[in-house]
Amino acid sequence: RLLAVELARQGHRVDIYDAGSPAAEHSAATVAAAMLAPLAESAITEPGVVRMGHHALTRWPQLLAALAEPVFFQQAGTLIVWHRQDAAEAQRLTRQLEANQHHVPELPALQKLDGAALAQAEPTLAQRFAQGLYLPGEGQLDNRQLLAALVVEMQRLSVRTHWHSPQSPETFTPGAPGQPDWVLDCRGLGAKSQWSALRGVRGEVVRIHAPDVTLQRPTRLVHPRYPIYIAPKEDHLFVIGATEIESDDLSPASVRSTLELLSAAYAVHPGFAEGRILELATQCRPTLPDNLPAIRQTRQGVLEINGLYRHGFMIAPAMLDVTLEVLNTGQSQLSQRFDLALDLAPASVPATSAAALA
């Protein structure tokens, strides 16, 4: 949807074919917490993805400002806390993040918080935690508001939308009369028949309304077995997740993982005890063998964009900008900066029309 909007804004004729509905209720994008945390995520990914996340922190405000509908966006940093018994794990993580920050020096340096500094940042957490880390500059957005705002924007820009219309690139003959110049395949796991290396990585997320919880920024709990994140949205809505399971199973969340998730959230803030569970959702993230995103051109006029793994919203603007470079110039300088796997056919023609598959 982001790509369709930006292409239409540039004056291209765009059709979008989506297997789902405007609400995108069965997509990983709807379930996600939409945290924009490149340094925090550097613990489990490569420097190129971290640079993509840093790039996105400057691009998201620009992209959101151009939308007619408001979208919650916050850039108040990330807080990381731990219990005393997990201090060794926290020290290991701290050293890792400091080393990663040296590899991507444009990122702001993390700040170590003692009890007094933690109390100033998040007063309610100081009652349970003696130390913490603050990662300045990181942020989050409301993914569901964004998905809805992009639907409105597509209507405003006369993007032709085809809901409940699953398609594959084979349906089209790019460049032929009456056909688009480009087909952009952004289907995630829906493209597995074309991109056999794709796999699903399952995640489980709970949404809780908790008026007694006053967290002001995304907060992560260090735990050797069960680390969690808590992303506070507007109106005391909290998105809480942790699990990452090597499986494309879309069945409901298990009792065990749900109990662990809720127990860990309560351990961070007692106000969750009286919260109300609004939703317990599972979804699978499209992931390539190296857990890194990639863009490839399989034939003239067909570009496949996939493998965003757990970093979809964090790197989406970077993937967008690389794709726009390819469509407009036939190559991308940004992809080199991001160490992004980009496999293009020898000759790419600039686009005037496009069909996006979602």
Could you describe each region identified by the protein language model?
Residues 2-10, 35-36, 70-74, 187-300:
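Active-site substrate-recognition segment that forms the wall
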Residues 8-30:
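Glycine-rich FAD pyrophosphate-binding loop
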Residues 18, 114-115, 161-166, 279-281:
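Short loop/edge segments at beta-strand edges and connector loops
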Residues 33-117, 121:
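Dinucleotide-binding Rossmann-like beta1-alpha1 core, especially the glycine-rich loop
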Residues 44-54, 84-89, 133-149, 252-257, ...:
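Short beta-strand to alpha-helix junction loop
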Residues 126-182, 186:
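Helical element adjacent to the flavin cofactor pocket in flavoenzyme catalytic cores
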Residues 275-358:
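C-terminal catalytic lobe of FAD-dependent flavoproteins
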